[in-house]
Swiss-Prot record:
Catalyzes the epimerization of the C3' and C5'positions of dTDP-6-deoxy-D-xylo-4-hexulose, forming dTDP-6-deoxy-L-lyxo-4-hexulose. Involved in the biosynthesis of the dTDP-L-rhamnose which is a component of the critical linker, D-N-acetylglucosamine-L-rhamnose disaccharide, which connects the galactan region of arabinogalactan to peptidoglycan via a phosphodiester linkage. Its EC number is 5.1.3.13. GO terms for cellular component: cytosol. This is dTDP-4-dehydrorhamnose 3,5-epimerase. It catalyses: dTDP-4-dehydro-6-deoxy-alpha-D-glucose = dTDP-4-dehydro-beta-L-rhamnose. The record marks 138 as: Participates in a stacking interaction with the thymidine ring of dTDP-4-oxo-6-deoxyglucose. It comes from Mycobacterium tuberculosis (strain ATCC 25618 / H37Rv). The gene is rmlC.
Amino acid sequence: MKARELDVPGAWEITPTIHVDSRGLFFEWLTDHGFRAFAGHSLDVRQVNCSVSSAGVLRGLHFAQLPPSQAKYVTCVSGSVFDVVVDIREGSPTFGRWDSVLLDDQDRRTIYVSEGLAHGFLALQDNSTVMYLCSAEYNPQREHTICATDPTLAVDWPLVDGAAPSLSDRDAAAPSFEDVRASGLLPRWEQTQRFIGEMRGT
């Protein structure tokens, strides 16, 4: 596998080596050695999620408070999604910046979203199936949303068939980025680096 850090520090695109023959294909989705090579620590999986979305469904933006937040190792096993990570860590040199990765069932890429970042994705095809390994179990008291179409963030979501994205009631009612910031819920850069540094033993 090859890992490339995105424009948001702490987020990586992972591209596997795919072996194809007459039977089909095989690839290693995750190895401890490969993960440690870019993240500097092992991935302690506490929950595994699967979502199936129709074309045009937008899920996010979601983040969890530190500690322990919730890192995610995300891939699309069927269909395709436009996957987005946003730097919401106050004090970060890239605060407010976003980056994206196309996850699909052709290149089989994965995105790793470390603790303290916001995440969301837009399904580009019907029955787009996303699997994600999570470093912590879901905790509704510490899980929060940010408006995915907030003009302050200006995420360039692609239109699917020219239609506005379909959101859950919760995501549609998500507060703006500035409102979440004013509420004091956003993580701080130093806090996240200290938390991750402890996992790395540094």
